[in-house]
């Protein structure tokens, strides 16, 4: 079982290790050499706004193993607007499980927790071609493929 909570400053080193692994594997991609620092800055901004009670459209969820109380994964969701500027859906921008915890159903539990925590929101996720595990996880959790770019990036949408 997992506990889902909002991330805080002390989670950033754990998350950045997973981001580094994701960049290495090709699951995450950022332009330029400063991509890693850009992600860190973005995460720090989100946790600072949480700490200061500033409303934002981003959700940084951290998932802890219940018995050990240690983080095993995270997800960053971002609110997206339509052309009129209205909130239209949430995008799962980043999603990762610690390498030593993969293959144990943790990703499935994390995704289920996200779905349950965001009722009434349209959820979407995009995957780069190397993200085969994530594509399978999404497809097996009620997400349907809605778009594939020429570069192979696939976008999925949750369907009840």
What spans do the regions from the language model cover?
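Extreme N-terminal starter segment of soluble prokaryotic enzymes
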Residues: 1-4
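Conserved GNAT acetyl-CoA-binding A-motif
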Residues: 118-129
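Conserved acetyl-CoA-binding loop-helix of GNAT-fold acetyltransferases
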Residues: 97, 103-116, 136, 140
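Acetyl-CoA-dependent GNAT
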Residues: 6-10, 20-29, 33-93, 98, ...
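Hydrophobic pocket/interface hotspot
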Residues: 15
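Conserved N-terminal glycine/acidic-rich loop preference
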Residues: 89-93, 132-146
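Conserved catalytic-core motifs of GNAT/GCN5-like acyltransferases
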Residues: 126, 142-158
